[in-house]
Amino acid sequence: MPPLFQALTTALFFCGIASNPLFQPSLVMDMAKVLLDNYCFPENLVGMQETIEQAVKGGEILHISDPDTLANVFTSGVQGYLNDPRLVVSYEPNYSGPQTEQSLELTPEQLKFLINHSVKYDILPGNIGYLRIDFIIGQDVVQKVGPHLVNNIWKKLMPTSALILDLRYSTQGEVSGIPFVVSYLCDSEIHIDSIYNRPSNTTTDLWTLPELMGERYGKVKDVVVLTSKYTKGVAEDASYILKHMNRAIVVGEKTAGGSLDTQKIKIGQSDFYITVPVSRSLSPLTGQSWEVSGVSPCVVVNAKDALDKAQAILAVRSSVTHVLHQLCDILANNYAFSERIPTLLQHLPNLDYSTVISEEDIAAKLNYELQSLTEDPRLVLKSKTDTLVMPGDSIQAENIPEDEAMLQALVNTVFKVSILPGNIGYLRFDQFADVSVIAKLAPFIVNTVWEPITITENLIIDLRYNVGGSSTAVPLLLSYFLDPETKIHLFTLHNRQQNSTDEVYSHPKVLGKPYGSKKGVYVLTSHQTATAAEEFAYLMQSLSRATIIGEITSGNLMHSKVFPFDGTQLSVTVPIINFIDSNGDYWLGGGVVPDAIVLADEALDKAKEIIAFHPSIFPLVKGTGHLLEVHYAIPEVAYKVSSVLQNKWSEGGYRSVVDLESLASLLTSEMQENSGDHRLHVFYSDTEPEILEDQPPKIPSPEELNYIIDALFKIEVLPGNVGYLRFDMMADTEIIKAIGPQLVSLVWNKLVETNSLIIDMRYNTGGYSTAIPIFCSYFFDPEPLQHLYTVYDRSTSTGKDIWTLPEVFGERYGSTKDIYILTSHMTGSAAEVFTRSLKDLNRATLIGEPTSGVSLSVGMYKVGDSNLYVTIPNQVVISSVTGKVWSVSGVEPHVIIQANEAMNIAHRIIKLRTKIPTVIQTAAKLVADNYAFADTGANVASKFIALVDKIDYKMIKSEVELAEKINDDLQSLSKDFHLKAVYIPENSKDRIPGVVPMQIPSPELFEELIKFSFHTDVFEKNIGYIRFDMFADSDLLNQVSDLLVEHVWKKVVDQDALIIDMRFNIGGPTSSIPIFCSYFFDEGTPVLLDKIYSRTSNAMTDIWTLPDLVGKTFGSKKPLIILTSSLTEGAAEEFVYIMKRLGRAYVVGEVTSGGCHPPQTYHVDDTHLYLTIPTSRSASAEPGESWEGKGVLPDLEISSETALLKAKEILESQLEGRR
């Protein structure tokens, strides 16, 4: 029994009253029928009627005497199950039913009165239109009162800048009125809603209207819809549509969650009625409905405050344009990255600001876009101006007293100097002064502050309490920590406001003795360290001159400026200065990140600890380099990297190192970067790592043998007699020798008779390399032995050649059957060497991911007496084919694909390769049977078939590659580039020449096509000129002969001489050549133009001039010149050849391309391969004089660019001579 009626009968049971029975079983059945026929969610009522019948027959429903109680019970039951509060059962013996439409029909005057009292409008401050609608009228009423609404209300709202649509009091309306409300605010013909009506079982789609009375408000101006908890029905639907079309911002309360259409329907013949929603809305915009749940506003406020809130939102939105204008101006005039400004100015105004409802939204939107476009964290837009705590104005020189005692006292106050144990200098000052002040105080500073610390070995500069100040003294202070002999570039400042770029260098001369560039300097920082103090710390770090210790600095630079926006609480911080360090890196704000991050209070102790550690760095760097020189497999690389490491130390590159872990990280990075070998690695370990020494392999017992074989090897014979072998570790050669007979019996013998073999190495991470020759030997013949690779061992400085073995257990797979190896990023070490060996020797096709690039042998060595260890590959593998060291980056497969797709690709390639011999046979037969020159075709076919056993075809991986290979071989054998093989995928078969017929234009298009395709002219001396760049089929030509004569031929036929320009003619069908040639001979005298031999029909065809032509002929007497070029091809060459051979035309230009008669295209078996074969040839020429493949030699060979001028010159001379 469905839960609805379980709930209903249970309620009836507990409310049952034995006396005065009111309930009749038919009442429930009648109610069910009403719901089934009218409820707008019929799918929720499946099985209801049958359940009721069973409940009634079973006596589960008792009698209730009170009708109101019974109505409440029914209401509770249907609402509880269907979760629909709109379903209400009532007992109303005096209900007379709804009035008929006729009784509700109103006069025009009554309609206007109704409209005037249900629609109100106003123009609010800020040119905001206000329209309140309490009843959405239907289509019929709109037709009657529409002009009145437009003229008296809408036209007055149209000039407003924004519109508030107030639906807070709209509780009723007609569905047919929804498109009218929405259409005035949106574009035409947009699908806005779908309404299902249950009584008629129909769905009606609502669209915005294509035409309206009056103008549309448009989709640009802002619209705000006001709602309340009383907004109901049709008004809810309109609100929902406008919200989800992003056309309006909904402000107010969540709506009632009513219905588009509810009806109170009588239940049977009783006095009970049920209110049922008979229609439902399903939005095409969201796929959901607002019914029951209501429309949630974009901005939630009390209904009484909604209008004020809407006006506030519109005020903010109206400011967007003003804010954008100000922002663009500020950026254009101030942003330091001037090259990024055009993109910003173009992008920002075109963003979608439809969701902006507050200044916070404007700030968030614009800030996100600014960050995305510029990637500049300094460029920040905020909704409230945060007051930055900036240092006070720096002391200026004019404010400094002249009294020496007071100057000395000032220096003593500002600077704190002491000498710490270990000859460590300590200097603290809490503000940067202007360089003019430093100049005035310099003698006192040098004597009192600087001279005592110049004799120290290391110096701690305490900036933890330094709030910055003027940065003009920073270059001077930096100069004290550099060598004075060299002018060093410190940084570059680009000031956008001043449009200046300053290169700042160290001072060559300073007062007093410089500290120099070799001693240790340690700068202490805190969150308070700001402006000039940050610049100093940043530059000391970027110049590799100091180790920074403490907290990340404040990020309070003087490179940016805050610009407020007029009339708002918004402001934008714009970097007006770009600070570029000596490495060319831009400092994009943010605090300076210390090399050692500790709490400010702990920074001094940490500095002392690092000072004690730093002397040990160079021995460790040198020791690491020495280990490389001794053990790394490639000596020349080892010496280079060792030198780089030591040079970096001498240049201060290790000052950022603060402990052994950071030293290990930096050494690893430097070694890998400079060697290109990712296997070099330095690491820190408190305890000495266990170094596994080579142990003699344990030979498994017979009991262990089966387990090992099952664990390491997985085999299967796949459909098509394809073997599959997976093994996940390379075992030692001694184990292989010991278990060889069992391995052959249990594994190998099941695979050796397969036609091809897939070896799955995707999960093989390596193992012992000693077994590689054994495994490889199974895939080569016993003789000759194959040189697989050479292993060079640095520890012994010897190379060992690795060869296949003359004898193996069991039968070999041989050297001819295909092998496919599947790889992944996990494939490593010995598995890589096995894989690469077979790839180098073209013995296998590799499919999958590039392998990991793990070394065959890696030694681990301790660096001095420290806790640092370095792993160094001490063997390299040298290719037997190229003689070069194998790359350390791993093996790249022939077919790179994700590892999980490798098996599918392997099957696809296997299937293709099984077809290759048949494809070759088919292609050869097509050439032999159809090639225009029979002897050549037979010779090419014979040689082509012999190529099938070549390695090139055995390594084909795709039909594309096969097509390219066949094409190259056929053209190489035939010396005919018109004999082609192409790959044409399924989705491109509409482009197959000679297979898919060309689309013939409609007759209506022919006239324009002819005018476009033919170019005619008449030069001086009555010389005609005609050019066309392609020959048409004779059938097509016959269809348009009248048009050709009218629009082309008549313009040149009566001239005294004619130039036919074939320089750009690429050929086409040859069937129209007799027609064209006939116009240049005399009528009534047939002329044999050519003999054409067709190989497909093995017949010779004589080509004659035609007796009947449309229009008059040019005749055989008037001079005719044909222009040619190296582009002239195919049918154009045949025409030129005929006219020259018969002496009818004089040919001027270049030798033609040497094409052929139009070839035929043949499909090769069930592949996507097609052969294009020349099947016809001209047979009139003497042997060896045909134009096919050689071209037509002109009578006058000159450049095609000058051919026309030369032709005109020749014809003018001839015509002049005749006169």
Curated annotation (Swiss-Prot):
Subcellular localization: Secreted, Extracellular space, Extracellular matrix, Interphotoreceptor matrix; Cytoplasm
Signal peptide residue numbers: 1-22
Glycan-modified residues: N94, N116, N201, N499
A GO MF label: retinol binding
Pfam families reported in the protein's UniProt record: Peptidase_S41, Peptidase_S41_N
Tissues with expression: Expressed in retina; at similar levels by both cones and rods. Weakly expressed in brain. In embryos, expression is restricted to the central retina.
CC per GO annotation: cone matrix sheath; cytoplasm; extracellular region
Biological processes, Gene Ontology terms: proteolysis
Gene3D superfamilies from the UniProt entry: 2-enoyl-CoA Hydratase, Chain A, domain 1, 3.30.750.44
Keyword field contains Signal: yes
Residue spans of the Sequence repeats: 127-301, 423-598, 721-897, 1022-1198
Domain of life: Eukaryota
Matches recorded under SMART domains: TSPc
PTM characteristics: Glycosylated.
CDD domains, per database record: Peptidase_S41_IRBP
Cross-referenced InterPro entries: ClpP/crotonase-like_dom_sf, Tail-specific_protease
This protein's UniProt keywords: Cytoplasm, Extracellular matrix, Glycoprotein, Receptor, Repeat, Secreted, Signal
Region: 4 X approximate tandem repeats, residue numbers: 127-1198
Similarity section: Belongs to the peptidase S41A family.
Entry function: IRBP shuttles 11-cis and all trans retinoids between the retinol isomerase in the pigment epithelium and the visual pigments in the photoreceptor cells of the retina. Also involved in the transport of fatty acids and retinal development.
Subunit structure: Monomer. Interacts with retinol. Predominantly found as a monomer, but to a really lower extent also found as a homodimer.
Protein name: Retinol-binding protein 3
Source organism: Xenopus laevis
